[in-house]
UniProtKB/Swiss-Prot annotation:
Summary of the knockout phenotype: Deletion of the gene has no effect on the growth properties in LB medium. The expression of about 40 flagellar genes, which belong to class I, class II and class III, is significantly increased in the mutant, resulting in high flagellum expression. The mutant exhibits increased motility and higher pathogenicity.
The name this protein goes by in its record: Cyclic di-GMP-binding protein YajQ
Signal peptide: none
Annotated SUPFAM superfamilies: YajQ-like (SSF89963)
Mechanisms controlling activity: Activity is regulated by cyclic di-GMP, which binds to YajQ and enhances the inhibitory effect of YajQ on flagellar synthesis, allowing Salmonella to survive in the host.
Binding site for 3',3'-c-di-GMP 2: K135, S136, R137, D138, D163
Naturally occurring in which organism (per UniProt): Salmonella typhimurium (strain LT2 / SGSC1412 / ATCC 700720)
Function: Cyclic di-GMP effector that influences virulence by regulating flagellar synthesis. Binds bis-(3',5')-cyclic diguanylate (cyclic di-GMP or c-di-GMP), an important bacterial second messenger that controls a wide range of cellular processes. YajQ influences Salmonella pathogenicity by inhibiting the flagellar gene transcription, thereby allowing normal expression of the flagellum. Cannot bind GMP.
Effect of R33H: Decreases cyclic di-GMP binding affinity
Length: 163
């Protein structure tokens, strides 16, 4: 029986490349000359720290970062940015988390979405991924389109497609 897994992962190497590209652009931009502005990736806890002298510049840095990550194949929805920026001394910063794995509430929404679609497939939650099995490949491709089309707040990848 054909099956596949629904996962939500961020390739840390691609994230590092995107952060490096963003830092390179910030260093060459005229509006950031003479300004303390940094973007750092912390591999251990999978966060990106964006720091600058004003909250407006932090927003600009986040826009640059999102654009560079998108070019590296990482969608902006996989970056969890808090609404409030932290003001410390003369700098503003924000720590954005990279979303890894699918939370249980989102998993339940996906399973409910699949069951409500009346397709002849089964969805099982396995840790931080969802295994979908069905009799026909067409049903599985319909599930892929359904999950991509559903607004669930984070990007999903499909792995281990078996026929």
């Amino acid at each position: 029986m054909p099956s596949f897994d629904i996962v939500s992962e961020v390739d840390l190497q691609e994230a590092r490349n995107g952060v490096d590209n963003a830092v390179r652009e910030v260093e060459s931009r005229f509006d950031f000359r003479g300004v303390e502005a940094t973007i750092e990736l912390n591999d251990a806890n999978k966060t990106i720290k964006v720091l600058s002298e004003s909250d407006f510049q932090v927003n600009q840095l986040l826009d640059i970062l999102r654009a560079k990550l998108l070019k590296r194949g990482i969608e902006g929805a996989s970056l969890d940015v808090p609404d409030e920026f932290v003001h410390s001394g003369k700098t503003w910063y924000v720590e954005a988390k990279l979303k890894q794995g699918i939370e249980s509430a989102v998993q339940k929404k996906i399973v409910k979405l699949i069951k409500d679609s009346k397709l002849k497939v089964q969805a099982q939650i396995q840790g931080e991924e969802i295994r979908v099995t069905g009799k026909s490949r067409d049903d599985l491709q319909s599930v892929m389109a359904l999950v991509r089309g559903g607004d669930l707040g984070q990007p999903f990848q499909f792995k281990n497609f078996r026929d």
